[in-house]
Amino acid sequence: MYLANFELKDFRNFEELKINFDPHVNIFIGPNAQGKTNLLEAIYFLALTRSHRTNSDKELIRFGSKFAGLQGKVHKSQLEVELKLRLTPNGKKAWVNRLEQKKLSAYVGQMNAILFSPEDLALVKGAPSIRRRFMDLEFGQINSEYLYFLSQYRQVLQQRNNYLKQLSIKKANDLVFLDVLSDQLAGIAAEIISRRIKYIKKLNSYAQSAHSEISGQAEKLQIFYRPSVKEITPDDDVETIYQKVITSYKKNRPNEIRKGTTLSGPHRDDLDFLINDKNAHDFASQGQQRTISLSVKLAEIQLVHELTQEYPILLLDDVMSELDHRRQSSLLNYIHGKTQTFITTTDLEGISWEIVKEPKVYHISAGTISTKES
C-alpha cells in the first residue's frame, strides 16, 4: 500500500498543496515550525480522520478559512482508492471513490497508517489514557466493528454518567433505567474488551520478536491487557466478559451513584509493559522506553499486514534523532521494501543512508514545499 498523490487545502499553515510521492521513502527536511509535522499530520488524518496532536478538528483549519480539504490516491495490491475529507467547524465528511460515506467507520481502514513520534515514548510511562488512545487508533483502523462499538460505547457511557450524576444529586431515582443503561453499556464493553485482548495477544507476539532482535536477545518484552474489571481473564469469551462487567456495575453501584460516574470498563482499562518480568512503567530506563516504543511500532506494522494483507504507510515524525545507530538500523532494516515511509528531520545528518536507498527529499519552509535530489 502506498499514497501516490496528495492534495490539501487550508490545513494548518498550508494554503494549498499538490504533490506526488515516491512509493518507497520520502523525506521532509527543514527548520522547526515550518510545516513538516503538519504535513505528516495531514497524511495521518487522511487515513484515520483523527489527529495525533489534537482532539479539536477546528485547530486543523487554517486561520481565516472556512474549511480544510484533504485528498489522495492510494495504491493497493489489487486496486486504487481515491480518498477525500472535508473539515468544517461543525464536523467532517468523507468520500471513497467519490461516494460520500454515511459513517466514518466505513471510511477508516481504506488507508492504514502507523505514526511514530517522540511523544510515543510516553506510551510506557505516560497516563493510561495515552495507552487507551493507542489501542483505539490502532485497532479502529483494522477492524470497523471495533470502531463502531467504540462509538456506541462513548454515547451510552455519556448517558449512563449523566444519569448517575442525576442520581447523585437526587434529581432522579429510577434504578430500573440505570439497569437498562448498565446492560447496554456492559454488552458494548464486552465486545471492545474481547477485541482488545485478542489484538494485544497478537501485538505482544510481534513486539516480543522485534524487541528481542533490537536488544540483542538481552531482554524479554511482554505486553498485557489490564482490565479495570479485575475478574476478566484473557481466556474469557464475550458472554463471560459481559457477565463480569454487569456484576462489577452492581457491586459498585453505591459508589458510582455517590461519585456520579462509571468506575470500570474499557474507558478505565490499561496496558502493562514488562521487561524481564519487571513493570517497565516503574523500572525502564529512557533507552529501554525507546526500545519498547520502537518494538511496538514494528509490531503494529506486522499486525496490520496480518489482518489486511497490506503493509501500512509509516510516518516517522522527527524520531530518527531520538534513535541511536543500532535502533535506526533495526527500524530501517525491518521496514525496507515493505512500507512506504515518510520521514521528517531538520537535517540529513545521522540517517542510515546505507539502508535508505534513493529517497525523495522535499524541503519545507513556511508552509511551502520544494523537491531536490538526495
Curated annotation (Swiss-Prot):
Keyword terms: ATP-binding, Cytoplasm, DNA damage, DNA repair, DNA replication, DNA-binding, Nucleotide-binding, SOS response
Name of the featured protein: DNA replication and repair protein RecF
Keyword DNA repair attached: yes
InterPro entries, A to Z: DNA-binding_RecF (IPR001238), DNA-binding_RecF_CS (IPR018078), P-loop_NTPase (IPR027417), RecF/RecN/SMC_N (IPR003395), RecF_2 (IPR042174)
Biological source species: Lactobacillus johnsonii (strain CNCM I-12250 / La1 / NCC 533)
Residues that bind ATP: 30-37
BP-aspect Gene Ontology terms: DNA replication; DNA synthesis involved in DNA repair; double-strand break repair; SOS response
Xref: PROSITE patterns: RECF_1 (PS00617), RECF_2 (PS00618)
Cellular compartments annotated: Cytoplasm
Main location (coarse class): cytoplasm
Role played: The RecF protein is involved in DNA metabolism; it is required for DNA replication and normal SOS inducibility. RecF binds preferentially to single-stranded, linear DNA. It also seems to bind ATP.
GO molecular function: ATP binding; single-stranded DNA binding
